[in-house]
Structure formats: structure tokens, C-alpha cells
């Protein structure tokens, strides 16, 4: 416990010394690094006036790092977005809701999947979603917003637009991912969550595909077996955010580069083919984009 406290204190000192809000005209985004080289999805945004926004938050193993990061930036989260209810995206939030300590959350934004969709995945995933929604339904401490495509709102100069919501006609929780665009006058991001090929095609055929145009695109499903090649080729973006552990990025389960059963190397080739060379990968460490 003493070692963990010292580590978190060091993280807090680093953030406060180098990342405190200044009189600048754009927000800051951090892509948080993998803590145990596992899949996860965790982004923290700070507005020019110090308001905090979290995208997903990551798996259970990410909890204490995320908690320390948020606390060092003031501990009050104005908005927490959940792309879809898989534990590698929301379990850190669950842990913080159960034991907030100094953290205060004001608003949670998500696209609630139907009871029928919940039952399409069995076992642990099914129970975790029910636990999450029970917490949402029974807490007066924060507001929960159920979002839909076309919803737009602004938080301290940062704009948001929902491009995709839960898709009950499609299989798999991944295809229920809420796609979020975030921007100001300086830069723009689109977060795809774990959107699958089917969900990507539905978005591509919708009126909101034009809004996918952005500077930074979060690669779907950790960069493999998410949106298909046609989606990435049609989307307009200049840089990639990879919430991806090393073994996924290299498709290496222990037998060497590209020896696993994942599609990451194929997706990486698509990105090269598109001419994009700016890639930010979570296993390589903390990324700060100003």
C-alpha cells in the first residue's frame, strides 16, 4: 500500500507540475497508458478552465492509475462518457462509483442498450451490464444521460456530437458503441469505442458519416476486428489513437510478430495505405495532445 501511495503521489506531482490549466484557448487530451498490458480504453480531457471529461476509463486494472490522474487534476469530473458496456471500457468507472474517495462525478453519458440486447451475451458480461445499469438507476449523486445520434452539447468550450447509438438490430455489444465527436476551433477527435464492421457500415450509410471527419480518430476495437477497410478509407482523419496493448498491436501472443489470430497488422497496413504516419499507442506510454 505504501508503494502504491508513493507511485500515485509521483503521478500527481508530475501532472500538477507539467499539465495544470493555463490561459490557453484549447483543451488538453491525455491517452492513458496501459497499466498491465491489457485491453482497455481510457482518455481524460481538461478544458481551458479546468473542467474534466473522461472517455470510458478502462478495465479494473486501470482503476488506481485513473483515480490518481483524476485526483491530481482536481477530482471533479464534469462528464463521463461510456461508449458501450464491456468491462474493459467501464469497470474502472464501476470501481470509482463504488468507492469514490475524493472523486465527484456530475454527469454520465451513454447509449443504454435494450434488455433484449443485454441477454445476447451470457455470463460475466451480462451480469456486469446489469450491475452498471442498477447503479445508474439508483444514484442521486450524478445525472445519467441517454444519448442519441444528432445530440449536441457543449462543455466549457468543448463541443460534442453523438454520431451513433445502440443498435438493437445488430449482434454483439461492440456494435452498440456510442460514437462521439469532440472538437473546438483548434482540433477534433472522434471516438469509435469498439464499433464493429456492421455498426461501422450503418454509420457509413447514415447522415452522420460526414461528421467523422476529424484530426484524431480512435481506432475501433483496439485497432483490430472493428470497423472495416471501407470505413477507414472513407473516413477523413490525419492521426490515429490506438487504445491497444503490445500483444494486440503486434498480433503476438508469445510466438512472435503477427503469429496470433488478430487482424491488427492488416488494419495497420490500411492506415499506411491511407498515408497516415501519426499514431499514438497506449502501450508506449502517456500521450498528451494540446
What is the predicted role of each segment?
Residues 20-75, 140-213, 286-290:
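Core dinuclear metal-dependent hydrolase active-site scaffold
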Residues 107, 113-174, 239, 244-290:
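Binuclear metal-ion centers of metallo-dependent hydrolases, dominated by the metallo-beta-lactamase
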Residues 48-53, 60-111, 206-224, 236-241:
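Active-site metal-binding motif and surrounding structural segment of the metallo-beta-lactamase
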Residues 9-14:
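Hydrophobic helical h-region of N-terminal Sec-dependent signal peptides
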Residues 38-39, 60-62, 85-91, 114-118, ...:
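Active-site environment of divalent metal-dependent phosphoester hydrolases
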Residues 16-18:
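C-terminal motif of bacterial Sec signal peptides marking the signal peptidase cleavage site
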Residues 31, 55-59, 79-83, 110, ...:
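Second-shell loop/turn segments in exported
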Residues 1-4:
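Positively charged n-region of N-terminal signal peptides that target proteins for export
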Amino acid at each position: 500500500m505504501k508503494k502504491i501511495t508513493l507511485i500515485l503521489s509521483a503521478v500527481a506531482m508530475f501532472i500538477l507540475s507539467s499539465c495544470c490549466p493555463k490561459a490557453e484557448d484549447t483543451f488538453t487530451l491525455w491517452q492513458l497508458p496501459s497499466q498491465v498490458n491489457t485491453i482497455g480504453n481510457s482518455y481524460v480531457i481538461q478544458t481551458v478552465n479546468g473542467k474534466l471529461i473522461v472517455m470510458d476509463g478502462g478495465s479494473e486494472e486501470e482503476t488506481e492509475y485513473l483515480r490518481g490522474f483524476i485526483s491530481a487534476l482536481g477530482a471533479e469530473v464534469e462528464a463521463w462518457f461510456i461508449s458501450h458496456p464491456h468491462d474493459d471500457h467501464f469497470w474502472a468507472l464501476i470501481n470509482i462509483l463504488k468507492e469514490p474517495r475524493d472523486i465527484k462525478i456530475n454527469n454520465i453519458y451513454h447509449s443504454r442498450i435494450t434488455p433484449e440486447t443485454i441477454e445476447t451475451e451470457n455470463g460475466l458480461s451480462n451480469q456486469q451490464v446489469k450491475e452498471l445499469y442498477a447503479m445508474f438507476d439508483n444514484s442521486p449523486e450524478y445525472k445519467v444521460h441517454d444519448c442519441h445520434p444528432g445530440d449536441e452539447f457543449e462543455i466549457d468550450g468543448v463541443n460534442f456530437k453523438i454520431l451513433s447509438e445502440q443498435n438493437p438490430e445488430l449482434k454483439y455489444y461492440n456494435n452498440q458503441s456510442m460514437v462521439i465527436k469532440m472538437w473546438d476551433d483548434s482540433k477534433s477527435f472522434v471516438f469509435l469505442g469498439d464499433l464493429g464492421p456492421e455498426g461501422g457500415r450503418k454509420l457509413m450509410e447514415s447522415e452522420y458519416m460526414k461528421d467523422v471527419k476529424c484530426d484524431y480518430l480512435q481506432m475501433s476495437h483496439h485497432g483490430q476486428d472493428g470497423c472495416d477497410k471501407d470505413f477507414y478509407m472513407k473516413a477523413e482523419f490525419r492521426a490515429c489513437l490506438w487504445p491497444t496493448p503490445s500483444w494486440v498491436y503486434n498480433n503476438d501472443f508469445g510466438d512472435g510478430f503477427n503469429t496470433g489470430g488478430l487482424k491488427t497488422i492488416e488494419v495497420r497496413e490500411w492506415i499506411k495505405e491511407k498515408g497516415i504516419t501519426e499514431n499514438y499507442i497506449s502501450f508506449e506510454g502517456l500521450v498528451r495532445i494540446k
